[in-house]
Amino acid sequence: LMNSKYIQSDTKGIYQYVKQLLQSNAYVLFSGTPCQIAGLYGYLRKRYDHLYTVEIICHGIPGQEALDLHLTHFKSTKIISFREKEYGQYASQHTTLEINGDTKVIARKDDLFYKIFAGWLLDRKSCSNCKYASLNRVSDITIADFWGGHYKKEQFEKGVSLLIANNEHGHNLLVKTSNLQLNPSTIKEAINSNPNLYLSLIHIS
């Protein structure tokens, strides 16, 4: 899991486009927050064998206005990456911005947007008691950072990803994906330092 986005994606027109692709028998991999996945299923009103859905473990979604203020502060118009891992998962660098055609990396200690986000101060009220924050996941596959288990920083300097196959459909996709290095784990390890897998913000705070 790389290049996380701490803002909700714009889904305008995307559900209609996905339906068109599915009706033409194209394979579709749709990723988003759990509520976006649920929204897609609600729009389609049926399941397609050639549709695969992937959700992130969501920490709540800030509004667009907060991001716009962040960009204005740094006189930037574009965020290239929210999680720069050139020097590893645990380096101090964090956000990469584009400013006047050049790139600027903002250290984590100077990234106010990230600090406020990590403190759960930017999330929408609708996220505070999210019904999708449950071990009964809505998508075929769930992804996130893997903070639990026995892995050492030195083994995987850019971090370890968590992949959960929530149903047979998702499991079959992972089995077919031959270029992944997969190691088995347990739900107990998965939820270590990842409470949003099963708790909404109101229960965490």
Name every feature range the model reports, one short phrase each.
Residues L1-S205:
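Iron-sulfur-associated redox domains of electron-transfer enzymes in respiratory
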